[in-house]
A protein has these predicted regions:
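Juxtamembrane C-cap of transmembrane helices in multi-pass membrane transport proteins
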Residues: 2-15, 20, 65-76, 82, ...
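Hydrophobic/small/kink-forming positions within alpha-helical transmembrane segments
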Residues: 2-3, 33, 57, 61-65, ...
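Helix-helix packing/entry segments at the starts of transmembrane helices
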Residues: 23, 80-85, 159-174, 220-254
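Loop-to-transmembrane-helix transition segments
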Residues: 42-66, 136-142, 194-221
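C-terminal transmembrane-helix exit sites in multi-pass transporters
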Residues: 86-111, 247-266
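Transmembrane alpha-helical segments that form core, pore/gating elements
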Residues: 32, 127-191, 202, 291-292
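Hydrophobic transmembrane alpha-helices of multi-pass small-molecule transport proteins
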Residues: 105-124, 264-283
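Transmembrane alpha-helices of multi-pass small-molecule transport proteins
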Residues: 14-62, 147-154, 170-189
Length: 292
């Protein structure tokens, strides 16, 4: 998903926020229709549990809006690190949503991870106005981690009753409809740029329009490939690859946007990576023991 985030951040100065969101979902639909149809034929829109599918769409939409917004307000690497802390919130919420019991090791990992998040947020500097970071951007990034955790827990439930290609397609269809409605009613007056009910997208430069199409296609590929990866690859390997996104995002943030993280942000990011990996590997070990 780093590729989609990089496109979004690159477009933030040229394209209205709502148009970026619109493109991400609408241009994903054709590819997702093909995947769903070839996977399930005439049953490609069949759903067994509409309540959970709608909840999946809600939390997926809210999470994406907050991540996309924070990318425009705070450094690329910091947004990624805070968003990747969702594993901490999954552990916090799982006893209440899934009824799971959390042991001492995972609770310890959660506490350590929250310390890492605290270090990255650096609230003391925000209160004293000694940092140029946006408090709104930081808040959105942390909230996106929380809503992504809710999404992950819902996806666990959906995995038992729904096909991933169908839920992904319906999620994009519902969200696209909501965004089109918002554009018709409110226009594109988001983040200080004013459009004429979305029509300005037709007169943007070719490169920007192409980038928006690529954003949608890449977004649909990310959804599909993630589903495949969880099907064919061990969770431990995926967890390691997932948290590589934090140093990679920091690297690209420095190379492309000249964003230099503070030592406190680096330490906090490393703590979050460590705690999330501990939670992940503990979960894998628990699963293997239960199978035996």
């Amino acid at each position: 998903s780093l590729s989609t985030h990089m496109i979004i951040k690159s477009l933030s100065g040229d394209v209205d926020f709502i148009i970026t969101i619109f493109s991400r979902f609408v241009f994903s639909i054709p590819f997702l229709i093909l995947i769903a149809y070839f996977s399930r034929k005439r049953l490609f829109l069949k759903v067994n549990n509409w309540k959970n599918v709608l909840l999946r769409s809600f939390f997926g939409f809210i999470t994406m809006i907050m991540v996309f917004s924070s990318l425009q307000l705070i450094p690329f690497g910091l947004t990624t690190a805070l968003a990747q802390s969702s594993a901490i919130f999954v552990t916090l919420l799982s006893p209440y949503i899934l009824g799971e019991k959390i042991g001492l090791i995972r609770w310890s990992a959660v506490i350590i991870g929250l310390i890492g998040v605290y270090l990255m947020l650096d609230p003391i500097s925000l209160i004293n106005n000694t940092t140029n970071l946006s408090s709104l951007g930081l808040s959105l990034a942390v909230c996106s981690a929380f809503t992504h955790a809710c999404l992950a827990l819902i996806l666990r439930k959906l995995g038992k009753s729904e096909h991933p290609s169908t839920t992904a397609l319906i999620h994009n269809l519902i969200t696209s409809g909501i965004i089109i409605f918002a554009i018709v009613i409110f226009g594109t007056k988001f983040y200080g740029k004013t459009g004429t009910y979305g029509i300005d997208i037709l007169i943007t430069p070719n490169l920007i329009f192409t980038s928006l199409i690529i954003l949608g296609i890449v977004g649909s590929l990310v959804q599909y490939l993630m589903a495949l990866s969880y099907k064919y690859t061990e969770a431990a390997i995926l967890a390691t690859v997932r948290y590589l996104a934090i140093p990679l995002a920091t690297f690209f943030g420095y190379i492309i946007w000249n964003e230099v993280p503070t030592s406190q942000q680096i330490i906090g990011g490393l703590i979050v990576i460590g705690s999330c990996l501990l939670i992940t590997f503990r979960e894998i070990r628990k699963t293997k023991l239960s199978v035996k």
